[in-house]
């Protein structure tokens, strides 16, 4: 496997099926729960902390599944889906680094919402700054992230934590 510095939607879906970064690597969700259309850039030496960064995007279409049910006559993207996308990207970073096992969100320090994603928006941009990765018996990534809608920052999250486990039966 050769690590690329950007990924298409098709490649992200392949990751969800264990076909991109290895069968035993952490996987992204697929179908409606994949909240990312492309990874614009990924590296292990950039970002605020010099330990890696990811910039990814989601194209907004008024026909996206959540606008029809959240809420009736008041459609808005659920904030938890943007937060989940951030966790998805931390897990993807660990897979990209070569982690083996199943990724699980472990927590977040602080989350702030200062805006909303509405059906008329065009694009969501996720920006993650990797703070730390641990590759011992425990594999874990910690990152700070923001979500922008059409260039305006509306979510921020600190200390997003994702672990990678070889056995999740007791988790």
Swiss-Prot record:
It comes from the Bacteria. It catalyses: a (3R)-hydroxyacyl-[ACP] = a (2E)-enoyl-[ACP] + H2O; (3R)-hydroxydecanoyl-[ACP] = (2E)-decenoyl-[ACP] + H2O; (2E)-decenoyl-[ACP] = (3Z)-decenoyl-[ACP]. Keywords: Cytoplasm, Fatty acid biosynthesis, Fatty acid metabolism, Isomerase, Lipid biosynthesis, Lipid metabolism, Lyase. The keyword Lyase applies. Gene3D superfamilies: Hotdog Thioesterase. Its main location: cytoplasm. Pathway: Lipid metabolism; fatty acid biosynthesis. Pfam families: FabA. Homodimer. Necessary for the introduction of cis unsaturation into fatty acids. Catalyzes the dehydration of (3R)-3-hydroxydecanoyl-ACP to E-(2)-decenoyl-ACP and then its isomerization to Z-(3)-decenoyl-ACP. Can catalyze the dehydratase reaction for beta-hydroxyacyl-ACPs with saturated chain lengths up to 16:0, being most active on intermediate chain length. NCBIfam families: fabA, PRK05174.1. This is 3-hydroxydecanoyl-[acyl-carrier-protein] dehydratase.
């Amino acid at each position: 496997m050769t690590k690329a510095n950007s990924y298409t939607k098709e490649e992200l879906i392949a990751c969800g099926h264990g076909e991109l970064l290895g069968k035993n690597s952490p996987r992204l969700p697929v179908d409606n729960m994949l909240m990312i259309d492309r990874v614009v850039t990924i590296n292990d030496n950039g970002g605020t902390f010099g330990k890696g960064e990811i910039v990814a995007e989601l194209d907004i279409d008024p026909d996206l599944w959540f606008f029809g049910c959240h809420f009736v006559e008041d459609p808005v993207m659920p904030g938890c889906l943007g937060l989940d996308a951030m966790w998805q990207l931390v897990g993807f970073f660990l897979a990209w680094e070569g982690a083996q096992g199943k990724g699980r969100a472990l927590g977040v320090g602080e989350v702030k919402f200062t805006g909303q994603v509405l059906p008329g928006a065009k694009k969501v941009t996720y920006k993650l700054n990797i703070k730390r990765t641990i590759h011992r018996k425990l594999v874990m990534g910690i990152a700070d992230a923001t979500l922008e809608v059409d260039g305006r920052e509306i979510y921020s999250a600190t200390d997003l934590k994702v672990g990678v486990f070889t056995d999740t039966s007791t988790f």
